[in-house]
Amino acid sequence: MVKLSGILEYSMGGFLCLRGFADYKTLSRVSKENPDVQRSLIEEHKGEMAEFLNRGLYRFFPEVVLSVSLLSNNNYADVERFFETVRTFGSWKENLGNINISIFNHEAGDKNRVAHFAFDESIVQLNRVDGNHRLSAADEVTSSFKVPFCLVLCRNTDEESQYSRAIFHNINSKQIPLKLEENLKVILTSENAFSNEVLKTDPSFGWAYYLARVAAKNINFSEYPFINLLIQQEKYTFLKETFDSLLNSGYLPKADIAFDMFL
């Protein structure tokens, strides 16, 4: 039996969600890839994620988003009664289909509703809306830790299919992501925060980061007008991706001499 606990609330007045923390491997085990929205796994990225989660000093990621349909054996009336109970701040302590749900309303303080969801993972499997790559690396991760999760509760499978597509779309299209160049510049120009040794050894970064930093400091691109024209405002991206390619192909070693060989 698996138990997930957290705060039960309508997120931004829309989706009913259970938000909390749970064991990483447990979340991976009780959830599955959602073919409606998930991209195919890239094995190389899976390995990088596993290394990061096993050894990364800066190990962190946002909550994984999961979904579940509460409909089971045509229990439409019970599902509607549950949503009405939540909407009217009532208490609940009974099975809803294959899930045992308990809701406790606090009369004082911040008014948060604590809820516990218990279910048999051989019967109930959660769907992954966002975070599939992170959860799929669990079989290669040796350490144990908790991660934040958001479980979106749906009235039926049709609603779950609609909600998961909409949420996946909003997560991946509504935000304005930083360009890779801006991300790299933050790391490579912050030597006081991220030493050369950290760049070399921490799985969050790697030798390509270190060599890109060294190259950016020591190469005057104005002396190479054609290259300068090509990379324009993406110097750090160009250097990092170039060193990634050279290191992965074996043309350069993961050693300080690599920069001299590059020149």
Question: Which residue stretches match the model-derived regions?
Answer:
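Short His-Asn-centered micro-motif
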Residues: S67, R128-G131, V152
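Short catalytic/ligand-binding loop motif for oxyanion handling, primarily in non-cytosolic enzymes
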Residues: S72-N75, L135-A137, T157-E160
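A sequence-level detector for short glycine-anchored, His/Arg-bearing signature motifs
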Residues: A118-E140
